[in-house]
Amino acid sequence: MTKEPIYSPRMLHRDPDSPRPVLPTQLTSSTLRCSQFQTNVFCLRERDLLERFTSEVAQLQGRGESREFSFLLSHQLAEDLGKAFTEKAMLQTILDAEAKLPTGSVKDVLGLVRSMYALISLEEDPSLLRYGYLSQDNVGDVRREVSKLCGELRPHALALVTSFGIPDSFLSPIAFNWVEANTWSSV
């Protein structure tokens, strides 16, 4: 009986034989907000983690460990890979929705939300530094850009929350009147 491969290269959404995306060393605001850069960094991270995971599992199996125990020993890579796959799928869903919108303010706001999602995902993922996808300076650039995006999204915050259709009873009082929620009488 032949062993089934741990994964199929077809699991990758991109052609596994295609060249790896190359990330710029200097990250500008426009680069960080570029959907192609965001797609490239998410695909590079997923592809590299998949290769690392399969290599580690294969090495452990080569030393006589069972496939199941090899998976257990590789849990950190498996966790990072699962997160990378999910975040890439979410980014692609946002990009697909954004592509269907006509040019205008809604598309512009969705672009800001997409950039916020992508950059927060990158900012909060320690595997980006652990495996060298981004430098410490790059992570600092990402953090600064997230702050800028927060400022740009602030005027749209109420409309964004309303667009999700969340019932008022599920929202904190601060969502309705920030000034009233933070007065001394209510604190």
Swiss-Prot record:
Enzyme Commission number(s) of this protein: 1.3.3.6
**GO aspect biological process, one term:** fatty acid beta-oxidation
Mention one GO molecular function.
Answer: FAD binding
Positions of region (Disordered) = 1-21
Source species, domain of life: Eukaryota
Fetch the Pfam families from UniProt. Answer: ACOX
**What UniProt keywords are attached to this protein's entry?**
Fatty acid metabolism, Lipid metabolism, Oxidoreductase
Q: Catalysed reaction per UniProt? A: a 2,3-saturated acyl-CoA + O2 = a (2E)-enoyl-CoA + H2O2
The record ties this protein, via PANTHER family, to:
ACYL-COENZYME A OXIDASE-LIKE PROTEIN, ELECTRON TRANSPORT OXIDOREDUCTASE
The similarity comment for this entry is:
Belongs to the acyl-CoA oxidase family.
Please give the name of this protein: Putative acyl-coenzyme A oxidase At3g06690
From which source organism is this entry?
A: Arabidopsis thaliana (Mouse-ear cress)
